[in-house]
Amino acid sequence: MTTNKYIATPSRTKDILGKYHFTFKKSLGQNFLVDVSVLQNIIRHAGITKDTAAIEIGPGIGALTEQLAIHADQVVAFEIDQRLLPILQDTLGEYSNVSVIHQDILKADVTKVIDEHFKEGQEVHVVANLPYYITTPILMKLIRDRLPVTSLTVMIQKEVADRMSGEPNSKSYGSLSLAVQYYSEAKVVMNVPKQVFMPQPNVDSSILQLTMRKQPPVEVTDEDFFFEIIQASFAQRRKTLKNNLTRFFKGVHDKEKIDHILQEAGVEGIRRGESLTMEEFAQVANTFYQYQSK
């Protein structure tokens, strides 16, 4: 198929939207990509080949789905907007390796879908242009569920991509960085200007790649408690670790006790949460956890 016939061009996208009298729903964060080269970059970074399978979230009118269908073995796309189903049937009609599921990804049993649609042991990648308003819940569900997928390569708001891939002592580093990086290795592979979308959003985007870890990079006694400690440490970014944790443990440990536990963990209480590595947070959480039942 020649490039000008691809869905992801301004003229073809306008034709499809006009044919179906489609209007964008702001509540669903619908912004369609109209630059084929950006899509092909996503496919390349995602490592999609004819041996791999792909899961897409929010296919829209099928621009990314089409590129996945061309390059992957099998594609399953989750679409929540019923109005798009007949459009997808039309635009993707020639691709026999695409299945569209009308379901909210947050309610889907993705592991079951993988088992039912893909070959046993096949390498699976999640590839998506995610709606900005629900990016974090979707990604956190997918990585916390520890799906049998190799990576997630997603187009998201640049600011969120920076936060998810943030490193200690940077403005973007916080509890979200640590949550994402506990389950995956995160890196921004490409920045994408807002001009390549229809309608044009107010912000620029980035392509973020999350490579799933087989094991977390740190050992923690209790995962929930570990993430509670992290959240508490960033509750007020300008405050010290000691002050934030004193507030968190109010009625349980006084300031003196918190100082003592932090010393035992080998971390100075005068530091701020943004300066701690994941290893240091694990040490702090594991040390405090020992005192939970004392």
Curated annotation (Swiss-Prot):
Q: According to its UniProt record, where is this protein located? A: Cytoplasm
MF terms from GO for this chain are: 16S rRNA (adenine(1518)-N(6)/adenine(1519)-N(6))-dimethyltransferase activity; RNA binding
Q: Which GO terms describe its cellular component?
A: cytosol
What InterPro entries is this protein classified in? KsgA/Erm, rRNA_Ade_diMease-like_C, rRNA_Ade_Mease_Trfase_CS, rRNA_Ade_methylase_Trfase_N, rRNA_adenine_dimethylase, SAM-dependent_MTases_sf
Q: Which PANTHER family match?
A: DIMETHYLADENOSINE TRANSFERASE, DIMETHYLADENOSINE TRANSFERASE-RELATED
Q: What does this protein do?
A: Specifically dimethylates two adjacent adenosines (A1518 and A1519) in the loop of a conserved hairpin near the 3'-end of 16S rRNA in the 30S particle. May play a critical role in biogenesis of 30S subunits.
Q: What family name appears in the similarity comment?
A: Belongs to the class I-like SAM-binding methyltransferase superfamily. rRNA adenine N(6)-methyltransferase family. RsmA subfamily.
Name it: Ribosomal RNA small subunit methyltransferase A
The organism is Oceanobacillus iheyensis (strain DSM 14371 / CIP 107618 / JCM 11309 / KCTC 3954 / HTE831)
Taxonomic lineage of the native organism: Bacteria, Bacillati, Bacillota, Bacilli, Bacillales
